[in-house]
From Swiss-Prot:
Protein name: Large ribosomal subunit protein uL1
Similarity section: Belongs to the universal ribosomal protein uL1 family.
Keyword hit for Repressor: yes
NCBIfam families (UniProt xref): rplA_bact
Biological role: Binds directly to 23S rRNA. The L1 stalk is quite mobile in the ribosome, and is involved in E site tRNA release. Protein L1 is also a translational repressor protein, it controls the translation of the L11 operon by binding to its mRNA.
A GO term, aspect molecular function: rRNA binding
Subunit composition and interactions: Part of the 50S ribosomal subunit.
InterPro entries given in the database record: Ribosom_uL1_bac-type (IPR005878), Ribosomal_uL1 (IPR002143), Ribosomal_uL1-like (IPR023674), Ribosomal_uL1/biogenesis (IPR028364), Ribosomal_uL1_3-a/b-sand (IPR016095), Ribosomal_uL1_CS (IPR023673)
Keyword rRNA-binding among record annotations: yes
Signal peptide (from-to): none
């Protein structure tokens, strides 16, 4: 607990909660706070100018970060025939159909992402109550139901993140690790913000990217001045 209280004191001393920080200063602070004995993630919260109660204003999608997430991702693919061979060649960890479904039903889910070809949805559809609550159900909106399973596997392995606003209109996701170079974190953040802009609902009014905050796994949030970003 001493380490945590020491970190908490440091954060209170260093972070002005009323201030928007230059991106470089924000990243420097995050790195200073990342003193946990594990490799901390850098997380982002983006407050969107949307009415999350309206389905036509919800924002959901996926994008590949230029510098990846720093996390090794295990990918399971539901497909068959030639697509199965392509998925394996692209680096899929587990490939199957009914046999893979049986593993899932038995609670054997040693994977982080599930991809399915359209013809496999008859099998995957039966697993909704298991995969859905875990955020693993394939969905065409985020590119995990696709005829191009090999491309989807490569995206997942190369640092694709999925995003979806919560009930308060906030996007929560990860943009890398605390030991990334500052320029890598900035590039990843700008790439995410660009993807969010492209996904802006037609009916959203006023300022769209209202607030951008960065934090490490065990750290406090630091608000970023968007004017210091290339994609602002």
């Amino acid at each position: 607990m001493a380490k945590l209280s020491k970190r908490a004191r440091l954060i209170r001393e260093k972070v002005d909660v009323t201030k928007e920080y230059d991106i470089n200063e924000a990243v420097s602070l995050l790195k200073e706070f990342a003193t946990a004995n594990f490799r901390e993630s850098v997380d982002v919260a983006v407050n969107l100018g949307i009415d999350a109660r309206k389905s036509d204003q919800n924002v959901r999608g996926a994008t590949v970060l230029p510098n990846g997430t720093g996390r090794e991702v295990r990918v399971a693919v539901f497909t068959q025939g030639e697509n199965a061979e392509k998925a394996k060649a692209a680096g899929a960890d587990i490939v199957g159909m009914e046999d893979l479904a049986a593993q899932v039903k038995a609670g054997e889910m040693n994977f982080d992402v599930v991809i399915a070809s359209p013809d496999a949805m008859r099998v995957v559809g039966q697993l909704g109550q298991i995969l859905g609550p875990r955020g693993l159900m394939p969905n065409p909106k985020v590119g995990t139901v696709t005829p191009d399973v090999a491309g989807a596997v490569k995206n997942a392995k190369s640092g694709q993140i999925r995003y979806r606003n919560d009930k308060n209109g906030i996007i929560h996701t990860t943009i890398g690790k605390a030991d990334f170079e500052p320029a890598q974190l900035q590039e990843n953040l700008e790439s995410l913000l660009e993807a969010l802009k492209k996904a802006k609902p037609a009916n959203a009014k006023g300022q769209y990217l209202k607030k951008v905050s960065l934090s490490t796994t065990m750290g406090a949030g630091v608000v970023v001045n968007q004017a210091t970003l290339t994609q602002a």
